[in-house]
């Protein structure tokens, strides 16, 4: 099952079919749907706030590429490419997928756009001084159509007013 794309979303979904196929292999069905939903929402927010729509779509699509990877494999990937976790990060396994995902995108998929890599890296923790793309992906992950936590509708309304909340 996939979200329904319209307009540029349909075009980008076709253009990045190779990445979609990789995601199908790497992610559970639920996480795959989530990744497509985040891509859709990131595209919408990019169009609304003046970011690059295609870059936002691609980043949203790939943001959880390592989420379903075993923690041991995530650590191996990080170590293989010289990324060492600090003591705080070592204790937060649920956040490793953002670091390993950024490495995977750069080293395995050969996407060398620093903005995309950074947006994937910080999509779980955020950071001070986030770029527009980082904010969009962070908030798209939080408000995508598959999310159903208490207060999500309020968050969706808020991101339609500003990305600065």
PLM region descriptions:
Residues 2-27:
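Generic N-terminal amphipathic, Lys/Arg-enriched alpha-helix
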Residues 33-34:
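N-terminal glycine-rich anion-binding loops that anchor highly charged ligand groups
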